[in-house]
Amino acid sequence: MKKKLTGIVLLLLFFAMPLQGQAKVKAPKKQCHAYAVMDAGSGEVLFGQKANKKIYPASTAKLMTAIVCVEKGNVNSVIKTKSDVVYRTTPGTYSLGIGAGVNYTFKDLLHMSLMSSAADATDSLAVGVFGSKKACVEAMNEKCKELGLKKTHFDNPVGSDIGAGYNETYASAKEMAKICRYAMAIPLIRSAVSKAHYSTQKGGMYVNTTNWFLKGMAYYDRDTYKIIGSKSGTTNAAGHVFIATAADYEGHELICAYFGNVSKESTFASIRSLFDYAFNNYKKGKLTLTPSNYDVRSSQKYGAVYSEYSALHCYPAQKDGLFAPNKAITRKQL
C-alpha cells in the first residue's frame, strides 16, 4: 500500500469519532439585533441570539448575488459597464466609481462587489449575467427556495432595505449563515473574500477589503484560528453587520453571522469574542465540531466517493481545503 501512496499529493487528516450528540453551551449575550454561530462542517447552529429573528442583511446580501452570478454566468467573460447601471445604482449604497463603457472581467466585478461592497460593480455584474437586476433578484429568490430558506427574501442585488424604500429584502441570522456556508463552498467566492487587496485585470482599479480582520485593523487570536473571509455591510435599518468565517488548524470552520451593532469597532470585537468562545469550548470538549472539505458541503458531485472517506473520518484534501480523492485507495485500505 505504501507504494500506491507514494507521490500522491494528498493531505490525509484523521479525526477521532465524534461524540454522540452535540453538547450545548450557553449563548453569550451581545448588544445586537441577532447573531448565529454555525459549524460550517455540519451546518448546525452551535449557539446564537435571536437567530431566527427578522433582520436586514445589508451588503451581506451580495453573497447571494455572487452565488447566482457564479452559477449562471461565464466566469471567464468580459462585461462592459453601462451608464444606466453604474450611474443609477440601487439607492442607499456605496459605489466605487467604476465608470461607464469600461470592460471589466467577470472576476474583476465579483472582487469589487465582495471586497469593497461596490454597488456599481454588483449591479453591473447582475445585469451582465442576467440581463437585468430584476432577473438577478428572481434567481436569488429561487436559490433561497432551493436552499430551504423561508425567512429570507431579496428585492435588489445589493442589500438595500426598508430605509431606502426596499421593503422586501430581509433575512435571519441563521439563514444568512446558511447562505455564507454555501458561498464559502464555491472556490471563486471563497478566494475573493479572503483577499485584503486586489488589482483588476482590466479597468485599472485597485480594491481594498472592508474586512478589518484581513486588513489587520481588528485583533484576533491567530494562534488558535484564522479568519478566512466573508462579507460586511451597513445600513441605518440593519446597523453594522458582518458574516465572518474562521478556521482552526485541525480542519474545523465556524461561521459567525452578526447583525445590528452600533459601530464597526464593536461588531468586529464581538465577533472575535464569539469565535474565541466557540473554539475554546471545543478545546474543553464542550462543543463538537465537524471537519470537512469545503467544496463538498453544498455539492453532490462526488457522491458516494466522499461518503467512503467521511464514514471513516478521513478527509483527503489539498492544502487549500478542496476535496482531492485518491481513487487508488480502497475503503479496505483506508
Task: Tell me the role of every PLM-derived stretch.
Residues 33-36, 107, 140-144, 289-333:
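N-terminal propeptides
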Residues 85-87, 219-220, 280, 314-316:
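Active-site/binding-pocket entry motifs
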Residues 86-98, 200-206, 299, 328-330:
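Short, mixed-charge aromatic SLiMs
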Residues 41-42, 250, 320, 333:
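Residue-level recognition of short loop/turn positions
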Residues 27-32, 131-291:
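Penicillin-recognizing serine hydrolase domain
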